Amino acid sequence: MFLAQEIIRKKRDGHALSDEEIRFFINGIRDNTISEGQIAALAMTIFFHDMTMPERVSLTMAMRDSGTVLDWKSLHLNGPIVDKHSTGGVGDVTSLMLGPMVAACGGYIPMISGRGLGHTGGTLDKLESIPGFDIFPDDNRFREIIKDVGVAIIGQTSSLAPADKRFYATRDITATVDSIPLITASILAKKLAEGLDALVMDVKVGSGAFMPTYELSEALAEAIVGVANGAGVRTTALLTDMNQVLASSAGNAVEVREAVQFLTGEYRNPRLFDVTMALCVEMLISSKLAKDDAEARAKLQAVLDNGKAAEVFGRMVAAQKGPTDFVENYAKYLPTAMLTKAVYADTEGFVSEMDTRALGMAVVAMGGGRRQASDTIDYSVGFTDMARLGDQVDGQRPLAVIHAKDENSWQEAAKAVKAAIKLADKAPESTPTVYRRISE
């Protein structure tokens, strides 16, 4: 038996906590026997004193074990359980292609996703722009879809890592969100509750990233890889670029449209293709569905070329109560904005810099995201045909096409786009889409 205040005191004085002490505290968070003040105090001591790797692993596993941990053994699946998690960005629609692509190659992807947070778009919000799409199937249905289709993308239920929800709510109001051990545990508790064999992390870098600097993004990626492997799940991470909008579009319905076009081969943005393929390659290698990069790429290209990946996406949409002919007739089903009009730069030049975060906030301001949890989303608004770094823009080539609900909203968005995109006399040097791979 432990006392919460003694655990806080021990950490306050700079000592490492035992696995038993950490589990006692986390179970107390779940059971409401530990107060908000005590949660805040421990969070602040961790913020200042950090945690050792064994402490980080214990914290993550205790948070994972505070709720249901999915077990797939009874389904006798003939492939690995694998997933990807992204720290979030703008135009980051990779999940919608990646899940079906990896499933078409023999993996099983029980993806538990989130809503939009701040300037970043949420996978669930994007999927809910599809009429009827059910992000909360019951447990039996979720398992059925995984067995039959190979991939399902659903929302987090209250039974998964419940201690994290309470811990995070306290961190949010006590300036302790940006602590690497606490971020790591929060991300991984939910992901590891999926019962995974392998996990790939997409940690964003740049003006639209969650972490403000390359060094902090790198530190987070290294922490996640170390902790997840310590918890028994094969995990690698990629540091990927978020100095510009990843896809050609940013919003909800507009990104779903681009995801379908990507899967069918109608249009594939080169940077989006690079990042999606790189993440899929990691997933296939980590889960032993491919022995090396070349084999993984060949398999992935094949399921794009032969239509299998698009077919899996269509089956997932239908299984989650969306239209059965969505892939063929997406334009008929996705909502369209009242006003669609291009915005042009005031001068000619090359796109040299992009405030990706500001562009994400512009989508939120148009109604495409939430400022508070109770807000309703306008799924039709957003940007398409986004200019990329190095593009030459003039009276013919716009900065973006804005999809808005009315003229006022369009004007505000146009102002935001012009302010977020800087031009120069010559094109900047190109930046990589993937900066670094991190493995154990």
Curated annotation (Swiss-Prot):
Q: Which SUPFAM superfamilies match?
A: Nucleoside phosphorylase/phosphoribosyltransferase catalytic domain (SSF52418), Nucleoside phosphorylase/phosphoribosyltransferase N-terminal domain (SSF47648), Pyrimidine nucleoside phosphorylase C-terminal domain (SSF54680)
Q: What class of enzyme is it?
A: transferase
Pathway linked to the protein: Pyrimidine metabolism; dTMP biosynthesis via salvage pathway; dTMP from thymine: step 1/2
Question: Which is one GO molecular function term here?
Answer: 1,4-alpha-oligoglucan phosphorylase activity
Give the PROSITE patterns listed for this entry: THYMID_PHOSPHORYLASE
GO cellular component term of the entry, any: cytosol
Q: Which reaction does it catalyse?
A: thymidine + phosphate = 2-deoxy-alpha-D-ribose 1-phosphate + thymine
**E.C. no:** 2.4.2.4
Q: GO:BP terms for this protein?
A: pyrimidine nucleobase metabolic process; thymidine metabolic process
| Keyword Glycosyltransferase listed | yes
> One Pfam family name from the record?
Glycos_transf_3
Keywords from the named record: Glycosyltransferase, Transferase
Give the family from UniProt. Belongs to the thymidine/pyrimidine-nucleoside phosphorylase family.
Its annotated function is as follows:
The enzymes which catalyze the reversible phosphorolysis of pyrimidine nucleosides are involved in the degradation of these compounds and in their utilization as carbon and energy sources, or in the rescue of pyrimidine bases for nucleotide synthesis.
Subunit text: Homodimer.
State what protein this is by name. Answer: Thymidine phosphorylase
